[in-house]
Every structure is written in C-alpha cells, then in structure tokens.
Curated annotation (Swiss-Prot):
The gene is groEL. It comes from Methylacidiphilum infernorum (isolate V4) (Methylokorus infernorum (strain V4)). InterPro entries: Chaperonin_Cpn60_CS, Cpn60/GroEL, Cpn60/GroEL/TCP-1, GroEL-like_apical_dom_sf, GROEL-like_equatorial_sf, TCP-1-like_intermed_sf. It catalyses: ATP + H2O + a folded polypeptide = ADP + phosphate + an unfolded polypeptide. This is Chaperonin GroEL. CDD domains: GroEL. GO terms for cellular component: cytoplasm. Gene3D superfamilies: GroEL, GroEL-like equatorial domain, TCP-1-like chaperonin intermediate domain. HAMAP family: CH60. GO terms for biological process: protein refolding. Together with its co-chaperonin GroES, plays an essential role in assisting protein folding. The GroEL-GroES system forms a nano-cage that allows encapsulation of the non-native substrate proteins and provides a physical environment optimized to promote and accelerate protein folding. It is found in: Cytoplasm. NCBIfam families: GroEL, PRK00013.1, PRK12849.1, PRK12850.1, PRK12851.1.
C-alpha cells in the first residue's frame, strides 16, 4: 500500500475553503437573469457554453488534492440538489460556500465546531418549516409557465412549451426532451398508449404513403408466447372474420405458417389484421402486457391462466377505437378498459414507485404510469448550431424538473426573497452559546443568493439586500427590470422543493466541512527523468 500524506486542523479546513471558493466562483457567476456564461473545454468537438450551475460544477477538477476535496464535496451539493429537485444547484453552491466561510471564521476564533453544526441544523429546520408556511399551491397553466420560464433562464418560449406539455398530459403524464432535426422547438403529444414495437411484416401496412397500418374499432389479442402454429390460431381468425372487425395481435413473435396465413388473408382482403412483437423483456414484458389488457378491457393470455389459444373467445380480446402501427411504434387510442380497473392499476404502480430503490426501475414504472394515466408529450428542442442545441436542451430539462417540483410542493417568491423572509424563523429560536452563533451563520447565509443575483447584474449586492429587507411580504428586486416589485405578480417564483433542497444540502455538506479535523490523500508521484539511452556515453566529440 502506497504511503499517504496528512494535514490537520486549520491547514485542513483552509485548504478545503480554497477549493470551495474556486468551485463556487465558477458556478455562482451563472445565477439569475443577468448570470454569465461559462465555456467548458471538451477533448473532442467544440467547447460547450452553458449557464447551468451543475454542468459547470461537474467539470471542475482541481490540481491540488486538498483543495480538490473541498470542491468535490460542494460539487455533491449541486449534483444532489439537481437529482432531487431538478434545479437550484447554483443557489445550493452559494449557500454552502457562505455557511462554511462564516463558520470557519468562528471555528478559527475558538468556537466549538460540533455546537456550531447543531445550531446550523436547528436554524435550517426552522427555515424549512417557514418555507412550507409561505408556500403557494400552483394553480393553472399560467403559474406553471412562470416557474418554467424562471428555471429556463427567463426564456418565455421554453416556459410556454413546458406549460403546454404538462397541461396536455397531466401531472402523471410523461414529458421527454429530444433533439430536433430543425431549428424550431416544438411539442408533440402522443395520445393513448404507445410502445416501441412496430409491425412484424411490411405487408400489414394499410397506408403506403405514411408506411403505417391503421385499424379502426379493432380487437386486440394479447399473447405472452410465440405463435407459429396455424391450427391454434384458426378458430379465432374465423370468429374475427365473421365479426368483420380488424385484429391486432401482440405476441412474443408471430412466425412460420401463422404469419404467412395472416399476410395472405390481409393481401386478399379477407381479414384486416396486423401483428406486432410484445414490448419489453422478462417480467417487465408480462407487466406491460397486463397494462395493455387492462387498458383495452381484454385478457393477457399467459401460461399462468392456462387458456389455450384455440379456446379463445371474442370476450377475451381487448378492444380499442383506433390503433396506429408504424415501423417502430404502436399506438393504442381509446381502449375499452373499465375506468375503475385502470385506476386500480395506476394506484398499484404508484405504490411500486414508492417502494422501489432502483432508479432504473422507478423510471420504467413512471413510464408505465404515464401510458396508463395521461399520455406522453415529447419536446423537440431545435437550435441553429450543435453547441446552442446542447445548452438549450440542458435548460429545457432543468426547467421541466423544476416545474414538476413546483406542482409537487408549491411555489415561493423568487429572486432570493423567500430565504430572506425566512430570517424571521431564526430570530424566533432561543439558543445559547455556539449554537446561537451557528444559527446566526445561517441567518447571514440566507442573504447570499439575493446578493449574488445583484452582483451578477453589476449592482451593489449589499445595498439591494438591505432595501429588500426593509420591504414586506412578497416584495423583492426584479434584477432584469432593475425595479422593486411583488414577486408573485411579476411571475418571479421558485419551486418550494428547489429552495428547500438547496438549503438542506448546502447546510449538510458545510456542517461536515466545519467538523473536519484531518485530511488524508495519496502522495503525488514525482515525474521520473527519462533514463539515458544505452551507448549515449562517449559521444562528447561528435558535432551536432
């Protein structure tokens, strides 16, 4: 095991501070409508230009190992805040730097770091409680648009599109963000349930121009296994032909004589039919087939039920008003399933989402929930250049996450006003000694987001903070218009969840940094001088 180097006490804490300050300086310049861009060098391709705090933070690696530890810990504040709330990464970084910097001054002056941390934690609890009390529930499309606009760095077009998307698919619907092939940013809403499987054979196509098969008022056969034997399928096909309605077959696969018969009957016009492979794999496939069965009012024919294909009745089939099958996607619109059964399935999936510990499983469950509950909206982000496209897509994703957070926990006045108004909660605490000093550190830190917003706009931050403190309620400073306004009326709002998460994460890491007493890292290897090549000696008389 290689030898390690250690540093202790003040040396350790000040090394951490240098790293925290360097990271914070790079990140906090992006805060607010007057925030600046940061250019990130990439080993391949053109540099990335961004105003997204967490994107900047993730790129920072410092040469000094002690300083780098501080930077990496604050980077975690930004990443965790982004993961949980989708935004507020820059605010979290500013708060972490402020709490640690002020706390370190007091530790250096002789305060007990453990008592300071307890004071910080108690102050944060009081502020979080106050934030929830001043929070407003998001009502209507206009307020959703305001939140999205603020989170997208004041881009009203992005705010409008996100508000439209959430309005159309509802709070349980899925909104995905994709890169467009043109320069405009557009919204596409997929009605009904869509899954990523297309027709097995192109002979099933009914619309040659669009290369799609459209089935109106169709029956749906949902089968877990492969269908290859015609004998098993024939009784059902005869019943379908008598009923005179189209049929969609969803199975693991359709092959051999079964597929040939379906194609021949489709081409002759005897039967309007289309076959697609079942979506997903393994247990997830079975769950998705059950979802389709419940949505369409049919039965999923699995081995567990013991129903043979030749014994299937028309009552066992699902039904839908319209089905569109493309080369790679199938969309089922207006399934005939019972509303109560669909709601029961939705509640079951919600419980699974709460219980799961896997991010991947949670994402897949949320997709299933969206397909059953509200549908799927796709925002196609367009831009003139690839560099702009990357930056814009990151802003859209941030704004979308923040908007969902706002719908979840409500909104508070933006522009740093909510945190400033929560100073009253700390004034109401009765603490003693170093715990009171810890609470005072948080009290002062709550001014920093507003101060940074004003500093980025080229104004005197301390003056703006004092002006806003003298005002009441939701009144604050509109940095873009350089005037004092009611933040709610001006549409300058932040999701409560974003503000809460930023403060909690910042205080958590700052508290850990304050109570650090020693640091350990590997000794950097010294570069070895290259060995003299063999036979290089004795060449002194040679001329060059």
């Amino acid at each position: 095991m290689a030898a390690k180097q250690l540093i202790f006490d003040e040396s350790a804490r000040h090394a951490l501070l240098r790293g925290v300050e360097k990271l914070s300086k790079a990140v906090k310049c992006t805060l607010g409508p007057a925030g600046r861009n940061v250019i990130l060098d990439k080993k391949f391709g053109s540099p990335t230009i961004t105003k997204d705090g967490v994107t900047v933070a993730k790129e920072v690696e410092l040469e000094d190992p002690w300083e780098n530890m501080g930077a990496q810990l604050v980077k975690e504040v930004a990443s965790k805040t982004s993961d949980v709330a989708g935004d507020g990464t820059t605010t979290a970084t500013v708060l972490a730097e402020s709490i640690y910097k002020e706390g370190l001054k007091n530790v250096t002056a002789g305060a007990n770091p453990m008592d300071l941390k307890r004071g910080v934690d108690k102050a944060v609890q009081a502020v979080v409680k106050q934030l929830k009390e001043i929070s407003h529930i998001v009502k209507g499309k206009e307020e959703i648009k305001q939140v999205a606009t603020v989170s997208a760095n004041w881009d009203t077009s992005i705010g409008e599109i996100i508000a439209d998307a959430l309005d159309k698919v509802g709070k349980d619907g899925t909104v995905t963000v994709e890169e467009a092939k043109h320069i405009e940013t557009t919204l596409e809403v997929v009605e009904g349930m869509q899954f990523d499987r297309g027709y097995i054979s192109p002979y099933f196509v009914t619309n040659a121009e669009e290369l799609e098969a459209v089935l109106e008022n169709a029956y749906i056969l949902i089968h877990e296994k492969k269908i290859s034997n015609l004998k098993d399928l024939l009784p059902l096909l005869e019943k379908i032909a008598k009923a005179g309605r189209p049929l969609l077959i969803i199975a693991e696969d359709v092959e051999g004589e079964a597929l040939a018969t379906l194609v021949v009957n489709k081409l002759r016009g005897t039967l309007q039919v289309c076959a697609v492979k079942a979506p997903g794999f393994g247990d997830r496939r079975k769950a998705m087939l059950e979802d389709i069965a419940i949505l369409t009012g049919g039965r999923c024919l699995t081995e567990d039920l013991g129903i043979k294909l030749e014994n299937v009745q028309l009552e066992d089939l699902g039904r839908a008003k319209r089905i569109i099958v493309e080369k790679e996607n199938t969309t089922i619109i207006e399934g005939s399933g019972s509303r109560s059964e669909i709601q029961g399935r939705i509640n079951q999936i919600r419980r699974q989402i709460e219980e799961t510990t896997s991010d991947y499983d949670r994402e897949k469950l949320q997709e299933r929930l969206a397909k059953l509950a509200g549908g799927v909206a796709v925002i196609h982000v367009g831009a003139a250049t690839e560099t702009e496209l990357k930056e814009k897509k990151a802003r859209v994703e941030d704004a979308l996450h923040a908007t969902r957070a706002a719908v979840e926990e409500g909104i508070v006045p933006g522009g740093g006003v909510a945190l400033l108004r929560c100073q009253k909660a700390i004034e109401g605490l009765s603490l003693k000694g170093d715990e009171q000093i810890g609470a005072n550190i948080v009290y002062k830190a709550l001014e920093y987001p507003l101060k940074t917003l004003a500093d980025n706009a080229g104004l005197e931050g301390s003056v703006i903070v004092n002006e806003v403190k003298a005002k009441k309620g939701n009144e604050g400073f509109d940095v873009a218009k350089r005037s004092y306004v009611d933040m709610f009326e001006a549409g300058i709002v932040d999701p409560t969840k974003v503000t809460r998460t930023a403060l909690e994460n910042a205080a958590s890491i700052a508290g850990l940094l304050l109570t650090t007493e020693a640091m350990v890292t590997e000794i950097p290897e010294k570069e070895k001088k290259p060995a003299t090549p063999a036979g290089a000696g004795g060449m002194g008389d040679m001329e060059y």
